[in-house]
Each structure stands twice: as C-alpha cells, then as structure tokens.
C-alpha cells in the first residue's frame, strides 16, 4: 500500500501514481501537458442526452467503490495490461474509507454497468479511471459527475493524460504552469464532495 500522507502530498503538488504493468513498480507522474475537463463548457453528447431522458441507468455515488476500482483495473479487450496495481487498489480503498476517494456508478437494474473513480481534495476532483459493461454507462456516470461538481462549486476536474476517449468528453490539454495555478486555486477551497 502507498503511504496515504505521501499520496495526498503528491496530488497537492501535481503528481499522480501509476504502476508499470510489467513489474508493478510505482511511478509518480507529472506530465508537461495536463488534461482537464472545462466544466463550464461541458455539454453531453446527443446520445448521452437521449439516454438520460430514457432513464435506463441509475447513478449512485460510493455504493460499490471496490467494484468500480477493480473493474477499472481489469484487463480490457484492446489492452491486456493495466496501470492499476493491487497496491494502488488498496491505497484508494483506504482513501475511500477516509472520504477522499469516490466512485460514481451507473447501474442498470442490479448490474454495475459502468462508472469511474477519483479523489476529491478541496475544490479539485482528480479523475483516475473509468469502465463500462454496457454502452454509454461510463459516459452517463461522467455526465452526472460533472453536473455534481458544478453544483458543488468545484474549480478543477483533472483528467490527467489526454487520450481519444477524454477528447470526446471535452478534455483539453493545458501547460503545466497553467495547471498548477488552477490546482493551487482549487486546493484553497474547502468543498465537501457529498
């Protein structure tokens, strides 16, 4: 398990952990460009809006954090390796018990159909990973997260490293210096997640 104090200090300084799938070694990452979701300009896609109207999924917070993080860590069809090691899982389970790590879950009946997890510190939410078992389930969870963070007054939704999926969700890359300024402002807020 990663030392919880060290983990929280790292996030406050703009770092996040990833483990190497080949040997399990932990690395602290601080990319030069940081992917963030500009919450004020976020708009759900037409498909997500349609699914929200149909009400096929129920979104819950923190009812199955372990189920979400383990689903995120599971091998995916297009990638056999994962950066989410058992050490990272145990650390985030402890952060969840402490009320710092949270899951946003899309339920389809009694099935955990998709979701995401991350950390809430001050006015910043650090999104870690998402998964889905039914089409659009993770996007529904993501949409509800953005709406929740907006309503609570969060200043930063950190998506860490840009990828095509995050781009579809509206993520943009910003330089390290701009990210650190946003992070500093967000960390000075005291906003409960729930």
UniProtKB/Swiss-Prot annotation:
Its main location: cytoplasm. Its EC number is 2.3.2.6. It catalyses: N-terminal L-lysyl-[protein] + L-leucyl-tRNA(Leu) = N-terminal L-leucyl-L-lysyl-[protein] + tRNA(Leu) + H(+); N-terminal L-arginyl-[protein] + L-leucyl-tRNA(Leu) = N-terminal L-leucyl-L-arginyl-[protein] + tRNA(Leu) + H(+); L-phenylalanyl-tRNA(Phe) + an N-terminal L-alpha-aminoacyl-[protein] = an N-terminal L-phenylalanyl-L-alpha-aminoacyl-[protein] + tRNA(Phe). It is an enzyme of class 2 (transferase). The keyword Cytoplasm applies. It comes from the Bacteria. GO terms for cellular component: cytoplasm. InterPro entries: Acyl_CoA_acyltransferase, Leu/Phe-tRNA_Trfase, Leu/Phe-tRNA_Trfase_C. It is found in: Cytoplasm. Disulfide bonds: none annotated. GO terms for molecular function: leucyl-tRNA--protein transferase activity. One of its GO terms (biological process) is protein catabolic process. Gene3D superfamilies: Leucyl/phenylalanyl-tRNA-protein transferase, C-terminal domain. Keywords: Acyltransferase, Cytoplasm, Transferase. PANTHER family: LEUCYL/PHENYLALANYL-TRNA--PROTEIN TRANSFERASE (PTHR30098), LEUCYL_PHENYLALANYL-TRNA--PROTEIN TRANSFERASE (PTHR30098:SF2). Functions in the N-end rule pathway of protein degradation where it conjugates Leu, Phe and, less efficiently, Met from aminoacyl-tRNAs to the N-termini of proteins containing an N-terminal arginine or lysine. Belongs to the L/F-transferase family. NCBIfam families: aat (TIGR00667). This is Leucyl/phenylalanyl-tRNA--protein transferase. It comes from Chlorobium limicola (strain DSM 245 / NBRC 103803 / 6330).
């Amino acid at each position: 398990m990663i030392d919880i104090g060290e983990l929280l200090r790292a996030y406050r300084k703009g770092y996040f952990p990833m483990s190497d799938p080949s040997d399990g070694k932990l690395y602290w990452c601080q990319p030069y460009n940081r992917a963030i979701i500009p919450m004020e300009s976020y708009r759900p896609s037409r498909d997500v809006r349609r699914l929200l109207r149909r009400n096929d999924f129920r979104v819950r917070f923190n009812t199955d954090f372990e189920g979400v993080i383990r689903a995120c860590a599971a091998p995916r069809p297009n990638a056999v390796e994962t950066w989410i090691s058992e050490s990272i899982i145990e650390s985030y389970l402890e952060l969840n018990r402490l009320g710092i790590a949270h899951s946003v879950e899309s339920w389809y009946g009694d099935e955990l159909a998709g979701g995401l997890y991350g950390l809430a510190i001050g006015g910043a939410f650090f999104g870690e990973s998402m998964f889905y078992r039914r089409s659009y389930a993770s996007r529904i969870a993501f949409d509800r997260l953005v709406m929740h963070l907006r309503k609570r007054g969060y200043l930063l939704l950190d998506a860490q490293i840009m990828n095509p999926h995050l781009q579809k969700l509206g993520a943009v890359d910003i330089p390290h210096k701009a990210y650190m300024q946003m992070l500093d402002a967000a960390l000075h807020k005291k906003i409960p997640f729930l």
